[in-house]
Amino acid sequence: MLLFTNVNLILALINRYEHGEFWPHLRESNYDYIGGPEDQPSAGKNINVPLNKTRLGDSDYLSIFNQILLPIAHEFRPDIILVSAGYDAAMGCPEGQMKVTPAAYGHLIHSLMAFADGKIGVFLEGGYFIDSLAEGAAMTLRALLGKILDLERRFQYLS
């Protein structure tokens, strides 16, 4: 409810959607759902990026960030960024069926650090393949700590 009554919040989501055929089959996950009731201050503050294909990878997610989410963040100028980090899109996860590498998670977080004076909270949401979840979380932490990201690193479970 906080989202519907607060004009100072933006909710941005990247979801596997498959034209509403993927769980949880919510109409609210589609691109044209833009937030609460029109008479609430939050109308237009919900940004959904529904993914209608599986097996999308780093370049797809980086494009979503660079072409959609980062320009919105630049315009909105947030005071803080909270990330619900679902690693379902990680390579090897049976639920997400995507191909995002652990290094890409680090890169995405690193790109968000340019906003809100680097004030970012990251909360684990999901991911069902422990190897890619662990590596993705490690790369996320490395980015938060300002460590150099090894984008060429190869992971044992991927070979």
Predicted regions and their residues:
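A general "terminal functional-core" signal
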Residues: 1-159
